Amino acid sequence: MTSADIRDVFELPPPEIGNKQKSKTPTERRPEGISRELYSLLGENSAPLAIYQKKFKEKPKVSHKAKNWVRQPFSISSRKDDFTLHHWVLKSEVDSEASYKFEKFNVPLFIIDYTDEEYQNYLKDEDWNKDETDYLFRLCKDYDLRFFVIADRYDNEKYKKHRTLEDLKDRFYSVSRKILLARNPINSMTAAQSSLLNTMEYNKEQEVIRKKYLIGLASRTPEEVAEEEALFIELKRIETSQAKLLSDRDEVLRLLDEQKGDGGIHEYHTSAGMSSLIQDMINSQRTKNKVEEAIVSSSAPSSGVSSVLNTPTRPHALSTPRIRYGPQPTDPQFGITWHEKLHPGTFVRSQKIPAIKASLSQRVSSVMTELGVSSRLIMPTAKNFEKFVELQNSIVSLLELKRKVDRLSQETEIQDKLSRKRSASPDGSESKKHISQ
């Protein structure tokens, strides 16, 4: 069976008779500079490097129409000659009478002028004559008070005097200030004139010293800079240690000044009690003087007060070599702390707050409320806990001191009343009767 028989069975149309053209696959053009054999070896793989082909720059595709520009001449109004410049502007914006748009930035400075009469009355100076002063003011107008340019252009040979930048500034501002004060007294000046007068302040000596100081700073060597930084750090350390030492000293003196007697005022009524009080005061003053001398003669700022108290003062203490102590591991900056007692298990730091007497707890809470401090720590860190305990102890000490003062004042008041009654009755019969009742 042939293919024609099969087509007859399935009633298929006969095949079209004609030459079919094969579809040609598009071939890429071989680039210049590569041989045909080498290019055929590449196959479908592209070249590893882009091949540069010389061609002209493509013309930009602009969708809108090009704008027309015109080269227009313009003049500067601040110039008195006929000097003309040109610039490019849009043809639609061409205006022969329009001013130059950057002309608004050409603002001349206000420089005071003076007359011959004003110079003779107010501006005479032994070191400056009128011609040189006029020359200085002309340069200031020409160079808009740019004193570095003025000092560079200044003709020192003409007047046979070497003028520094500070000399030129001092002469200009002193003349301007004198003229302004002569024309407008201070009492009748406006706000603008007062502001202008304040801007004319110039201290020549201060500027000279400042520039010398800056020159000295700029001429330092790296070794000198490092030494100054080390000295500054050492100064900060000494100031910190000195502040801590003074606070410890005040605390020790406060402890030494505390009264030792708790028996009330009755123990000082007799001569023996008064003698004991005077002796205690003398001993307290001697102890205070010894502590101050020991602290002053101490050579180590970071040694603390305890070492000062434990070390006796000797006459040859100043001749002993000074010992310089370095940083200790227990300094706060290293973050190392030593706990006095470790509690077993987990505990809250607020549990370590010392308990207050029941008679004082309510008063302590009221004082802390007046100070705006909560009686319960919100964030009980180590520093907050320490400050809170310190505040609580200070309040307790204050309340105890107030109680003693009130008690002493009451006893004093009673003694005053008794003394007045005794003085009222010579024999003291009324006072004895009053006491017996």
UniProtKB/Swiss-Prot annotation:
It is found in: Nucleus. Residues 125-176 form the SANT domain. Residues 1-33, 302-328, 408-437 are annotated as: Disordered. Residues 1-10, 408-418 have a biased composition (Basic and acidic residues). One of its GO terms (molecular function) is transcription corepressor activity. The keyword Disulfide bond does not apply. GO terms for cellular component: NuA4 histone acetyltransferase complex; nucleus; Swr1 complex. Component of the SWR1 chromatin-remodeling complex and of the NuA4 histone acetyltransferase complex. Component of the SWR1 complex which mediates the ATP-dependent exchange of histone H2A for the H2A variant HZT1 leading to transcriptional regulation of selected genes by chromatin remodeling. Component of the NuA4 histone acetyltransferase complex which is involved in transcriptional activation of selected genes principally by acetylation of nucleosomal histone H4 and H2A. The NuA4 complex is also involved in DNA repair. This is SWR1-complex protein 4. The lineage of its organism: Eukaryota, Fungi, Dikarya, Ascomycota, Taphrinomycotina.
